[in-house]
Amino acid sequence: ETTPKYWEVKKVYAPVELRVENGELRVTNRNHHIDLSLYRCLWTLSVDGKEKERGEITLPEIAPGESGTIGLPAFRSLKPLSDCQLKVSIVLKSDALWAKAGHEVAWEQFCLQKGDLASADLINKGALQVNEDDKSLLISGRGFSVQWEKKVNGSMTSLIYKGKEMLAHPDDFPVQPVTQVFRAPTDNDKSFGNWLAKDWKLHGMDHPQINLESFHHEKRADGAVIVRIQTSNLYKEGKVVTTSVYTVFSDGTIDLETTFLPQGVLPEIPRLGIAFCLAPAYDTFTWYGRGAQDNYPDRKTSAMIGLWKGSVAEQYVHYPRPQDSGNKEEVHYLTLTDKQNKGIRVDAVENVFSASALHYTVQDIYEETHDCNLKPRAEIILSMDAAVLGLGNSSCGPGVLKKYAIEKKEHTLHIRISSKQ
């Protein structure tokens, strides 16, 4: 079965290199013995994930090892505030012994214009009802409600949009959103000597103690309600302090800014993020970010920025030994929807994030040793991360490079949750 690394190898080994320099396309022939007369050069322009223009550029017969430049066309579909991506493809002109005409041998994507992410500034325009007792806090508005337990762990216990509950609450998922610092070790994490996976287990990263440190709320001048919750994930010699600031608006929008602060003695950190457990009905996953295959900070060259869609079941990669998979980098927004295309939407605020949607918790994957025995649950585990550790190559080579590791400093995940109708 083809796994995401195959696409990465194909991309990195491509026989033609493409760059944009000074408004022109620079083409380098990486072949040793043939020129580029066997290929065509095609392009597509996508705006916010939708193809708007396409065309072909005449490709010079560039000799092996040489480079040349081509003028780019004038694009008509660039729109202010929109994300505009140009994809250039090199494809076979004619059938070959090993592939048909049109087979893509190389491609590159160029961002012509970055789209605006959600702004941090949002004004409330309606009334909210706040009901509180010793154990819980309930905030409601027109067509929605959100509730927290405030004494044990500060968990969100309910999120209802248009009369439908978004969250599920299996016994083995007691806190929502749960701070996720651990991942099911990959083959590379186990590596020569198993050092990363061993370190994580030695420090208790796989089974943290979660403490509620504080919980309080207040009203803003415009009527929006701010809920501040601080929790700690405690490990053998260190901890990660999570501070979550929810701002609830009358239309059901929930702005969530979460900071993660590692403290004390900790091993290499696998991730810093949160996870929700969603009801089984919301099993169609759509995202604008890198895809369609899973990708990580140091393995995303082959994953294009685009608008992708698939079932949640399709997101997990079935390696023989269960391990972390399904991550998507540079997510601008995502939705999880039911058969009526209704559900929940999450937007990045100011900075993109990493995300996955799976039918497995981290523990489901971690505690199983054979893929054939891994049983999907009905619920959807939506993970969103401020930082994700790279994969490295230490199953047979070096570990994660420093630039793809997670610095032990404060990291922030800022998202905006709303109803998808």
Predicted regions and their residues:
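Short beta-strand and strand-turn-strand segments in soluble, beta-rich domains
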Residues: L38, L45-I57, H103-E104, G238-K239, ...
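Short, acidic/polar linear motifs in exposed loop/turn regions
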Residues: N31-D35, S94, G264-V265
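Extended substrate-binding grooves/exosites of carbohydrate-active enzymes
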Residues: E1-N22, H32-S37, L42, S46-E51
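Short edge beta-strand/loop segments characteristic of extracellular beta-sandwich folds
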Residues: E24-H32, T259, R416
